[in-house]
Amino acid sequence: MAPKNEKKSRSTINEVVTREYTIHIHARIRGIGSKKRAPRAIDEIKKFAKIQMKTNDVRVDTKLNKFIWSKGIKNVPYRVRVRLSRRRNEDEDSAQKLYTLCTYVPCTNFHGLTNVNVDSEE
């Protein structure tokens, strides 16, 4: 077999990036008991962010947490628009180099929205 002449490209996992997603929470917490719906919704958002951004360290912003809990523990909003930011960890002694910050994006109508790469404000 002939050797490959292609160069290895740089991994995109190590880059700092920001994206916006719509998460359909209603489908993810279907069948969960009424007193565990809001905590499970937070867990599902963290799981979604972990898969999409490929980081183990996921942090949820307080505004997103308050939006999920705004209608109580039982009546979680059906959908939420979130901004996932993969960032560099400032701690020198941390195990992971990168973490993901989940922030809330206010949205009234979810129709026609797609996943969007956002230019970094930093």
Swiss-Prot record:
Pfam families xref list: Ribosomal_L31e
A cellular-component GO term for this protein: cytosolic large ribosomal subunit
UniProt entry tagged with the keyword Plastid: no
GO biological process: cytoplasmic translation
InterPro entries: Ribosomal_eL31 (IPR000054), Ribosomal_eL31_CS (IPR020052), Ribosomal_eL31_dom_sf (IPR023621)
GO molecular function: structural constituent of ribosome
Entry keyword Transmembrane: no
PROSITE patterns the UniProt entry points to: RIBOSOMAL_L31E
Keywords associated with the record: Ribonucleoprotein, Ribosomal protein
Family to which the UniProt record says this protein belongs: Belongs to the eukaryotic ribosomal protein eL31 family.
Name of the protein this chain belongs to: Large ribosomal subunit protein eL31
Organism of origin: Caenorhabditis elegans
GN (gene name): rpl-31
